[in-house]
Amino acid sequence: MLQPKRTKFRKQQKGRNRGLAHRGSKVSFGEFALKATGRGRITARQIEAARRAMTRHVKRGGKIWIRVFPDKPITEKPLEVRQGKGKGNVEYWVCQIQPGKVLYEMEGVSEELAREAFTLAAAKLPVTTTFVKRSVM
């Protein structure tokens, strides 16, 4: 699963997920892409589950790019532990998603196959998404 090799600090504050994605909002590598239309956070497990669903559907044909990386640690305290005594341990990593962010890209397959693969991937993700094609300038 994806997670940073090393970070400056082990734990982060919660923060707020506001605004739109201006960076990473264009199709840069492939021909087709899955773009987020809602906001939320995607865990490393969800990123991997969606990638596996797409890869299996296209039968290892074409190329897939993952455009998001989980770089935010989420901490949790164990069950039945009272509040206080410091912040909990890092349990998993997430990527915060704003509307407009490109999540995955694909090339080397037909549009129909790409749409089907992205539909399978979208079912694994907690944010609403849409299918987009590279715009020719």
Swiss-Prot record:
Keywords: Ribonucleoprotein, Ribosomal protein, RNA-binding, rRNA-binding, tRNA-binding. It comes from the Bacteria. Residues 1-22 are annotated as: Disordered. One of its GO terms (molecular function) is tRNA binding. GO terms for biological process: translation. It holds the Pfam family Ribosomal_L16. Gene3D superfamilies: Ribosomal protein L10e/L16. GO terms for cellular component: cytosolic large ribosomal subunit. InterPro entries: Ribosomal_uL16, Ribosomal_uL16_bact-type, Ribosomal_uL16_CS, Ribosomal_uL16_dom, Ribosomal_uL16_sf. Part of the 50S ribosomal subunit. Belongs to the universal ribosomal protein uL16 family. Binds 23S rRNA and is also seen to make contacts with the A and possibly P site tRNAs. HAMAP family: Ribosomal_uL16 (MF_01342). This is Large ribosomal subunit protein uL16.
